[in-house]
Amino acid sequence: RNPCFSAILCGTALLAPPAPAQSADGAGLLASTPQSVEDLQRIERQLQQMLPRVLPALVCIELNNGSGSGILVSEKGLVFSAAHVVDKKGTTLKIILPDGTRLPGKTTAQNSNSDAGIAKITSQLNKKLPCVEKAEKMPRVGDWVFALGHGGGLDRKRGPMVRLGRVVSLKNGVIQTDCKLIRGDSGGPLFNLDGKLIGIHSRVGSGLEDNLHVPMKDFNALTEETAEGKTSLTPSPEQDSQPFSTQPS
């Protein structure tokens, strides 16, 4: 199914007609301010080129009576999500692929301070799964980004929801954007216009600028701490000693 596309840009939807494929030029668009309709259409075309690369890796995560989103980051079924979505380490989950396949999973690590959570598909796989590439650097304020998620819950007829926006703040090491998120989006991915994963949706706010995302550096730290067998998971140095509040979606 086609994704539900919602582009929030100063209250104006990007509804340019489909354009022929062109070479990706996300780097040149990342922090540029559109000066014309043509600029807006370039941004939308770039987004349309990236979606086929990343949508196959988007998953829905079901736990008890709730659900959230996640993104595959390895061909062997490793999933990044929000800690409040995957719950504590060892929790059993259902991970639903884009084609509707439901697979058993388990939470392998989480940090409630940063709200970073990692899960893994536990069933034996007979094929490599689609996955996305993680960005090596933090985004900059003003960068164009897009958010994916199963907002409102999994709906295969509608498809996943896509939101376009910009980074508005990097306060305390947390990414804040104006990508409008709703319940069910938590744990979903945030990408730059090159299609690289830069964050995971954590807090869903009522305002356009109230949406927070966990950056990749917190997942990298969590992965390293887990590999080293550490049991005490602490926030990254760039964050306040007090955790920011998370609002499950």
Question: Which stretches of residues belong to each language-model region?
Answer:
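Short conserved beta-strand and strand-loop elements enriched in small hydrophobics
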Residues: I61, T91-D99, V145-G149
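Flexible, gly/ser-rich surface segments that form the specificity/activation loops bordering the active-site cleft
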Residues: K128-V174, D178-D185, H201-L212
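Catalytic-histidine neighborhood of serine endopeptidases
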Residues: S67, S74-A116, S123-N126
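Bacterial N-terminal signal peptides that target proteins for export
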Residues: R1-A7
